[in-house]
Amino acid sequence: MANAERIRHVASIIQAYKDKKPVVVLSAMGDTTDHLLDAADAALAGNVDISGVEKLHRDSAAELGIDFSPFEPLMQELKQLLTGISMIKELTKRTRDYLVSFGERLSVRMMAAFLSKEKTPAKFFDAWDLGIVSDSNFMAAELLDEVWKNIPMELNSYASGAAKEIPIVTGFISKDKKGDITTLGRGGSDLTATIIGSAMKADEIQTWKDVDGIMTSDPRLCSAARTVPEVTYEEAQELAMFGAQVLHPRSMVPCLKAGVPVRVKNSYNIQSPGSIIVQKHSGAVPKVCAITAVKGVTLIDITSAGMLGAAGFLAHIFNQFLKWNVSIDVIATSEVSVSLTVNTKADLSGLLEDLRRVAQVQARPGKAIVTVICDATKSADVLSTGLVALAAAKINPQMISQAASKVNISMIVDDAQRDDAVKALHAAYFE
């Protein structure tokens, strides 16, 4: 929600669903998180300034006809925090989490106030008000198992009909057992929504984006891209891992556990049914579900005759990646070689030096992973069709890998060929 206009629009969506007893999870407004981090930088330099955050929310409240006085205590709390940062000249992870939490806390108060003004009773909740507790891994906290029983207990009066106000809940933030505010890392707001929906055994969880659900490919690349009506959790996780803007993979874990479907809808096109994420396809499994791609990876080829018949060689190789904290994306192996991809942003110097002590190693940056999400039982047909299409486009995959899940085939191409590869594959499978 970038501004007052978007608050009005989101409020209209909430009002359209009020008979279904929704629980609403919100992120911070617009650029609030950036404003907060800028304010922290200024405080570290000795300047306490909340004007960026205050102006956005004060102006939005005025435009929405909301009294700003209930927001003043939070503004004072923020100012006190920044004053403390300016005095000690330090921003710890714990303090950073406390700082960025103001974005979500202000957002839910704004929405609840506006809905109530518009005769739709609503009540804001900070996540910890619903018993959403985490460990103390600041900036990337994990929720504790007790949230599964806490949430239904705290929302029981609303679920039973005794309480009428629509709950408006902060996404992304939590508290640890000591009462310190934590943030849930990437996909944190989606995770808040899915854990609430799953714990409450909701009919479905809806996540509202700016596209018509999950698309067969990036519509900015493929004008013929269309909405995929239904995907499985497994397919959606693979799509998210390889660049598609769906739910973050970790946010799908609660709904997979509870069996609650997730619908991805477009806040700019509310009439579109979007896409639904389910445990199993309700009908025939499509041969190809979607194509996605991610740029900026490095392809590493590791070759050694010592691999042939040697027990533990791969374990030694992978231990080097663990030692240097480098995550592997895609992998393919043969009797004497391993090819794999890693994020180019990772510092590879120490890793490559260690690997070269036991094998011949070639690192090739500037690569892209193009992934086809498909039906495992038709992988031969999918692969042959795809390779013919790429050959016609004069694109030669430098590595091919099929995931253990059997729902994706990944091909490595040059960064410069990524867009053409996606277009060629989309034309072959969907057009």
Roles of regions detected by a PLM:
Residues 247-249, 258, 268-275, 348:
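Surface-exposed amphipathic alpha-helical tracts and adjacent flexible/coil segments at the periphery
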Residues 1-247, 252, 412-414:
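Nucleotide/pyrophosphate-binding catalytic subdomain
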Residues 271-431:
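A conserved regulatory-domain signal marking ACT and ACT-like small-molecule sensing domains
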Residues 21-24, 121-123, 164-168, 172, ...:
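Structural motif
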Residues 29-30, 129, 211-213, 260-262, ...:
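Glycine-rich beta-alpha junction loops
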